[in-house]
Amino acid sequence: STSVLSEIRKLLIKHEVIFFRDQDISHIQHKQMADFFGPLQTHPAYGTIKDFPEIQILESTAEKPTKIEEWHTDMTFRKHPPMGSILRSKVCPPSGGDTLWSSMTAAYNALSSPMKDLLKNLTAEHDFSYGFKESLAEPGGKKRLRDAVLQNPPVIHPVIRKHPESGKSVIFVNSLFTTKIIELPRNESDA
């Protein structure tokens, strides 16, 4: 119901991550819940569920392990990144298979005042092709991801963003998609 979704949204804004364990939801329910949080986006590199292009398939097997093991925020390579992501595990091994979460609000709050002052006016480049460099290097990777690279040119975002609803400051860089801090020399940006 709308009232339940409103309460979930309030909790998400407050806590930044929420978990619903052992939920058996359909693709339609998954999409309906996601719709409540804002416009849905498709990912340019992942396969999707038939008739549900907004639901991506992330699969990791012994034969084909995941390539994304770095800390990151999903789709920061977009001019308008999504508000968040909803992850639903269909098959989870008894050990491993973890998805970890970290608060960039807590990271910001832990910074000293001089560091906050340094970062507040900096911007960073986020690049799809940087995040998918391993996939692009695979045989056929450039051809397979050509359209995704063309449709997602590098974008610039503030290093420190304010959440539009909570007003909290968050660090908005990540090792997967952030290529450089624009205003710093390369050696400092890379540090």
Show where each model-derived region lies:
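Non-heme Fe(II) oxygenase catalytic core, chiefly the N-lobe of the double-stranded beta-helix
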Residues: 1-191
